[in-house]
C-alpha cells in the first residue's frame, strides 16, 4: 500500500484538536482543513496550506455547530510546491434549532474560553480565544440569516479517523464536495480562482475512491454533485481555470484529464 500523502495542515489541525479536546466526541472537521485528511493518492498535487480548521460541533443532543473555514494566525511560510493562504478567522456553523438554543451555545462557548469579538466591523457571530478567531454561523438560516444547506447532513454522516493519538470525526468526501460547491456559488461568487474550487479539484484529483463513495451516498447528494459537475464541465471558464489549480510541472498538468474523467463519472452517478 502506498504511503498517505503529506498533510501540510496536520500541525495546525492538531493544535485545534487539543484546544477543542473536551468536544472531540461531538465535533466533525469540515472545510479546507479537512482536505489533507481526504486526499489518499500520494501522486496527487500537494494540499495547499490553508491555516483553517473547520469542524462541526454538537454540544448536546439537539445543538451543534461547525467551525468552518477557520484560520489560526501563523507566520506565512512559502513552500516550493504551493502558495500559502493565511487568513485570520474560523467560521462556525450552528446546528441550533432555535434562537434560544443559540444563546445556550454561546454560554457554552464562554465556558470553553471564547469571548465575543468587539472589534469595529466584526460580525455578530464572531468569537475569539487567544489567536483563534471563530465565526459561529447557524445551520438554520432563519437564526442569523445565512447558512450552508449541506452542513447538517455532513455532521450526521461524519466518519471517524485518528490523528496524533486523538480520535476525531471528519466530513466525508461527498459532503465535502457539496459544502465546497455551495460555498463556491455563495461566498465565492462563482470565482474560478477561488480556494473553494481549488479544494474541490484537490479532492477530486487526490481521492481515487471518490466515485464509489458517491455511488453509496444519498440520492439527493448524488444528484447535486452530478448536476454541479455537469455544469462545471460545460463551462469554458472552468476548463480554462483547471490547469491553474494544479502544479505547473508536466506530470501534474497531465492529471487534468484524470480530474475531468472523474468528474464525468460523478455526472453519470446522478
How does the language model describe each region?
Residues 1-270:
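Compositionally biased terminal segments of proteins
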